[in-house]
């Protein structure tokens, strides 16, 4: 299955216990597809695969990119698909982001992350370090200001034309979002400058993880939750920053299955202390999500 990602590849993958890959922008051809506000690329949507296997992800990407789509879509990056495994001569350095300092993941997510880290840490060719998140609340302010630069007018017009009602989460991200405003050119330039400044700050943080000259010993991968919980009850998925963060930065990202909810292990923390108001809201949803058949990515 092929989806368009502003979180809409990785979240369905995580909710269903399958693999989902968000490439960087301008990797996969977009001829023949359509979206709301087509041509608005302040935060470009990208196309990527869902699959029941990692091999399916690799097959999709290699097949599409081996066809050299940049010959017909010049905006695409003319770069082959490269698959490079780690080895004793080229160890992998993984930075683990346990939470984003805004919202604490629910117990199944943290447990699954612990299990993955434990297995990776036992491998001789992998180094594990902690990754400190960089101002994710600020990142969300930038991102959500650039999602609907027309103030949501096209979305509102399409819904009015269709006669369909506003769904709760659509209202949440468009109508109720204080950052959604019709931007003047001057404001548009401001937020795009903020986007680029944030990207540079993040790049410096990443580059500073190097332990040797020329970037040697730098973190290769950030391992983190896909979201703050497992598949949510309808109309409750209001915290998007675990996925949208990587859209703002335009980093590739993959969701992969790890486990399922285990009620013997995944107990609600009764002594929980919230970092933020939205963290408290997310914690209060925890009991709704802890169903044993739920996948954990």
Language-model features and meaning:
Residues 1-64, 252-257:
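Short glycine/serine-rich loop segments
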Residues 13-16, 23, 39-45, 89, ...:
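Short, solvent-exposed loop/turn segments at the edges of secondary structure
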Residues 63-244, 248, 258-294:
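Amidase signature
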